[in-house]
A protein has these predicted regions:
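PRPP-associated nucleotide enzymes
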Residues: 1-187
Length: 187
């Protein structure tokens, strides 16, 4: 059987995902020491099954090291494969060197993910100069598209919506949602 863990602030989504997939939900706890280090503690996964870690990667700098330790720990505890469900996938927008000396974080982060996780599920990543995650992540990856669901929710809950995007690169998503709603948009 597959086992599912939720990183802190991802527990509610992990619970819902466990209900819909039938995966066994297990505990993952982080303890923060006064010096800023973090201890990861987790229940053992079902042997020979996938271990799935749910962690949205907004504000990634504080999340990535504990996530790396959780993935390594669950593998050491017997998981056959380790997968990541990341509703938001960080570090994708820096996908080229815009100025001399800048890191191409999309490639670096994709490489780290490839060393750490056997598969990945994410929602509409910031792929501007890459056509697929396969260009930067070497394992199976599933991209979930949510424009129709988002438009459906907005249509039910918002009167006369205006769809707003934070920057020019968000236009690809903003325009689809606005078109589905027949609503104006601004980027």
């Amino acid at each position: 059987m597959n086992t599912l863990y939720g990183m802190p602030d991802n527990e509610t989504f992990a619970e819902l995902l466990a209900l819909h997939t039938g995966y066994r939900r297990q505990q993952l706890v982080l303890h923060h020491f006064p010096d800023g280090e973090t201890r990861v503690q987790m229940a053992a996964p079902d042997l020979d099954g996938d271990a799935v870690i749910v962690c949205t990667l907004d504000r990634p700098d504080a999340k990535v090291l504990p996530l790396m330790m959780a993935a390594a720990t669950v593998r050491e505890l017997g998981a056959a494969r380790v997968g990541l469900v990341a509703p938001y996938l960080a570090y994708m927008r820096q996908d080229m060197r815009f100025h001399p000396g800048e890191a191409i974080s999309a490639r670096i982060f994709g490489g780290w993910l490839g060393h750490t996780f056997d598969w990945l599920v994410t929602v509409e990543p910031h792929l501007h100069r890459y056509t697929t995650l396969a260009e930067i992540y070497p394992h199976p990856a599933q991209v979930v598209h949510v424009a129709a669901q988002l438009a459906g929710w907005i249509g039910v809950h918002v009167t006369r919506p205006l769809i707003i995007g934070p920057d020019s690169e968000s236009a690809q998503w903003v325009s689809v949602v606005a078109k589905l709603l027949g609503a104006p948009s601004v980027v």
